[in-house]
Amino acid sequence: MEAEKVKCLIIGSGPAGYTAAIYAARANLSPVLYEGLQPGGQLTTTTDIENFPGYPEGISGTQMMEDLRKQAERFGADLRFGMATAADLSKSPYKITIDEEKVIEAQTVIIATGAAAKYLGLEDEKKYAGMGVSACATCDGFFYRKKVVAVVGGGDTACEEASYLAGLASKVYLIVRKPFLRASKIMQKRVMENEKIEVLFKHNAVGLYGDNGVEGVHLVKRMGEADEQRYDLAIDGFFLAIGHKPNSDIFKPYVDTDETGYILTEPGTPRTKVPGVFAAGDVADPHYRQAITAAATGCMAAIEAERFLLN
């Protein structure tokens, strides 16, 4: 099968991908965007977004992504369902395989594949997604003002999330599997000195319960030991802070990544080390992971693609 040739290929359909499509379409780059397995990305699992400028009453993640999608289509972006399964960025035009069969040859590529939150693997995690389970305290913490929440994890991210939530919630339980925190000393100190945070060392979360949302977590203290204890803890929100996995595997042979797989770009730009290949959104952002920062880098990537093609 002969490869399809395009000027600008965008891989991923969260705020980064859709914003890149809007800007690329307006620049007459005739962008083709493949939406992946979850059109709209992780934001479609967020019930309410209240921190994106321009939505004074808030908006659901699903509706925001649908609006961005329509806006991209309005300017002529070609949006398609399909997943990038292989990549050859060794030379231009760059070859991207979709669903293991169709090959696209692109003069420029914008990687906006995002990063997936790591889950514990509990049967109830997906059931309560958007109904008490979250992987982003900055995104969803506002909904738990004066409520009781639990954060799972023992590293810097977990401590940062717990500290942030302590400024909103009435009580924060930090559930730590090990008998110690892995976080930096300054973050450990911040957590241990916060009266609102109670650290539950040597605890495992093994399940969630609730009728119309999370009402509590099933815990095991000192799992596997002779004095193992099982009990339930009433909470209103359950925050996962055990890391994210960037969706960058197929690009790793060609672009630089950090030790966890986030694509490295030139500081202040979405440019990777491969000319004409750009990374936008959470796949290149281990720090902020916000809709607005993802959209901003999507814009930057499209502008860079336009400039690259002009030159």
Task: For every predicted segment, state its role.
Residues 72-98, 103-106, 167-267, 307-311:
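A Rossmann-like FAD-binding core segment of flavoenzymes
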Residues 5-7, 81, 145-147, 202, ...:
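Phosphate-coordination loops involved in phosphoryl transfer and adenosine-cofactor binding
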Residues 163, 167-171, 292-311:
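Internal hydrophobic alpha-helix adjacent to the cofactor/substrate pocket in enzyme cavities
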Residues 116, 121, 126-143, 242-288, ...:
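FAD-site-proximal beta/loop scaffold in flavoenzymes
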Residues 79-142:
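Glycine/small-residue-rich loop that forms an oxyanion/phosphate-binding "nest" at active or ligand-binding sites
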Residues 14-15, 38, 115-117, 156-157, ...:
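Residue-level detector of alpha-helix initiation sites
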Residues 6-75, 159-185, 258:
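Beta1-alpha1 glycine-rich phosphate/pyrophosphate-binding loop at the start
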